[in-house]
Amino acid sequence: MIDHKLIIKNIEEVCKKLILRNFYLDKKKILLQDQKRKILQIEVEKLQNKRNLQSKIISKIKINNKNIDIYKNKSNKINILLNEKKQKLKKIKKEIDNYLSTIPNILDEKVPIGKDQKNNIEVKKWGSPKIYNFKIKSHVEIGEKIKYLDFSRSAKISGSRFVVMKNKISYMHRALSQFMLNLHTNQHGYEEYYVPYLVNKNMLYGTGQLPKFYNDFFYAKSFFEDIQSCYALIPTAEVPLTNLMRNEIIDENYLPIKMTSHTPCFRSEAGSYGKDTKGLIRMHQFDKVEIVQIVSPENSIKALEEITHHAERVLQLLDLPYRKILLCSGDTGFSSCKTYDLEVWMPSRNKYIEVSSCSNTSDFQSRRTKIRYRKISNKEIHLTHILNGSALAISRTLASIIENYQTKEGNIKVPKILQPYMDGLKLIK
């Protein structure tokens, strides 16, 4: 969430910055709401002062054993009016918060201006796509041929956009998660967490998924029921990891906080009808290793480069060709002020596909979750900055390995870095 005071103070500048994201701020609405809030705030304060004055008068009269009925009646009328004004103030504040929750984050100055993904900028390429002397097969063809990917049985169980993995491919899927977690905990300084896969509405609001992306989730219960008994399956471990520090004040010397978790992720893929209905690319359920950093504001720019590098190391050690993309203003996610996507090479498609998204949310998520830190120098309390990254999406990484490491016979070579995690296995056939 953007700071309300910042919007009011610099409304023209904020409007211009939000237009870059294809978001048009309703200036009239937000200024009118703020004007109502100010008037009600003043009225409440005046009535509180009147009430306090009446209380003092009543106390003095009591001491002198005089009749206080007239003053009590006056005090009661003030209290009734005060409660009415408080309710109106509460209502207008709620309206302001509701509108603020629909406004995306302000972009970093270095984000390129553009309408959509066509205007994203490639900032780096690593590795070269292999040249094959045989006809390339897709990961679906290879997996089904060796009978280790079963989409027909998964459809029987759950419908489209699911998969049943077995035998050596299931083994590699597990090995990938172990490799990623070991890399991030042993070499990159993250602490591993096991987190709930069901979260309540407040957690999704805190990380910015709600209210904008309401239709993207699978719900265990309707959110129209009691808030504490309503759950959604997590779309990413970013949600529970970030909310671990919700409503907390962290001493500055404990920053940065670096967390990682391997979880299944659940997404309805609303708006993706007909796209990638078969395969490991766009599924309702997939596994991912997530990395999250909570840092002081002055370190968040550096932290984004670091978190992206940590995701890149996974691809480099797997020897998978990829490219690093800086998202333009029109393609940057709702909560993010700056995002890099990592896209891995898919031979059967002859193109790169997204396998990681690394974002700096600045103080957008921390304002919603009230995650703050106390400075060592002056004990002042400020909002933290929060960053997150996929490191990596396991199913898509697996699909890329199957295709990039395929042999003429339709087998799959095991990347060297994964062999120790698979009892030295070198070939899946």
Swiss-Prot record:
Example GO biological process: seryl-tRNA aminoacylation
EC number: 6.1.1.11
Major enzyme class: ligase
Annotated metabolic or biological route of this protein: Aminoacyl-tRNA biosynthesis; selenocysteinyl-tRNA(Sec) biosynthesis; L-seryl-tRNA(Sec) from L-serine and tRNA(Sec): step 1/1
Subcellular location per the Swiss-Prot or TrEMBL entry: Cytoplasm
Record-linked CDD domains: SerRS_core
Function: Catalyzes the attachment of serine to tRNA(Ser). Is also able to aminoacylate tRNA(Sec) with serine, to form the misacylated tRNA L-seryl-tRNA(Sec), which will be further converted into selenocysteinyl-tRNA(Sec).
Gene coding for it: serS
Cellular component GO terms held in the UniProt record: cytoplasm
Reaction equation(s) it catalyzes: tRNA(Ser) + L-serine + ATP = L-seryl-tRNA(Ser) + AMP + diphosphate + H(+); tRNA(Sec) + L-serine + ATP = L-seryl-tRNA(Sec) + AMP + diphosphate + H(+)
Keyword Flavoprotein set for record: no
Entry similarity comment: Belongs to the class-II aminoacyl-tRNA synthetase family. Type-1 seryl-tRNA synthetase subfamily.
Organism, as annotated: Wigglesworthia glossinidia brevipalpis
Keyword entries, A-Z: Aminoacyl-tRNA synthetase, ATP-binding, Cytoplasm, Ligase, Nucleotide-binding, Protein biosynthesis
Residues annotated to bind ATP: R267, S268, E269, E354, V355, S356, S357
InterPro entries xrefs: aa-tRNA-synt_IIb, aa-tRNA-synth_II, aa-tRNA-synth_II/BPL/LPL, Ser-tRNA-ligase_type_1, Ser-tRNA-synth_1_N, SerRS_1_N_sf, SerRS_core, tRNA-bd_arm
Lineage start: Bacteria, Pseudomonadati, Pseudomonadota, Gammaproteobacteria, Enterobacterales
The keyword Aminoacyl-tRNA synthetase is annotated on this UniProt entry: yes
Binding residues for L-serine: T236, A237, E238, E290, S390
Name of this chain's protein: Serine--tRNA ligase
Organism superkingdom: Bacteria
GO molecular function: ATP binding; serine-tRNA ligase activity
Domain notes: Consists of two distinct domains, a catalytic core and a N-terminal extension that is involved in tRNA binding.
Self-association state and partner proteins as the record states: Homodimer. The tRNA molecule binds across the dimer.
Signal peptide: none
